[in-house]
Amino acid sequence: MANPRIPYVLSSARAPLPPLDGKRILVHLVVNVENWQFDQPMPRTIVTPPHGRETVPDVPNFSWADYGMRAGLPRILKAFASRGLPASTSFNAGVIDAYPQAAKAMRDAGWEFIGHGMHQKAINHAEGGEEAVIAASLDKIAGFTGRRSRGWLSPGLRETVDTPDILVGKGIDYVCDWVVDDRPSWINTTSGYLMAMPYNLEINDSIIYAIERHATGEMARRLEFTLRRFEMECRDSAIVLAIGLHPHLISVPHRIHELERMLDLLTASADVGFFTGSQLADWYAAAEPAN
């Protein structure tokens, strides 16, 4: 079965996209800020339990994520603020209650809030049903920030067959789950079109460090090679370069310098600009309107 939502087309056969604010490599910094529930099994682990038996509470693996929310996030905030860079956060709405200082710090920094469920749990397993969880999380973010989220990233990028239709019905303009191209695409839904915003499964600290378990430095190495390629390819069309970040991974003491080095590498390129998800969505909708 072919992709039922996004018709197939070679990227090279698509019409060129114009620069945005004079830039051809459009960087989207996406910080995944998650609420791992203390009284539930952890969504991911770094410490294997003795005898292979999971326990709840899972203190070491909960603490892994909790450290990121306490000590890691301030490092990311400082790295972005010191360079004047805009960012988006894919945001579990439960963070508002669990980590109120963190939520306020991101709001005060002007980050864009992308819906990411209530807790770090796949929406197809959510209690109360997918639509209810999507609605509740978006409403909670709107109440906290004073504005509706325009973007969505499903926890674990996991959807059901109905997710795009539900998202459009809740007023979402773009979703980051469909990583099919280096430029946005249009997703067919029962109620019109939804934008597939490029995300990244290659330059993503969760993939590199939590799943593939590479040594520190691998993420910067991949970014360097990607930037070299995009500096060539962006002559033909503007390109979106998303970078997926997690406070408990990229901003531990032995990796935060890697993030800083990556940011400096990007800012040194004349082709690179930094944008939020909404800025990218407005740019693409104007350049290539949905039919």
Residue spans of the language-model regions?
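C-terminal amphipathic alpha-helical segment
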Residues: 202-204, 208-221
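Catalytic alpha-helical scaffold of carbohydrate-active enzymes acting on polysaccharides/glycoconjugates
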Residues: 2-195, 220-243, 249-291
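A structural motif
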Residues: 189-207
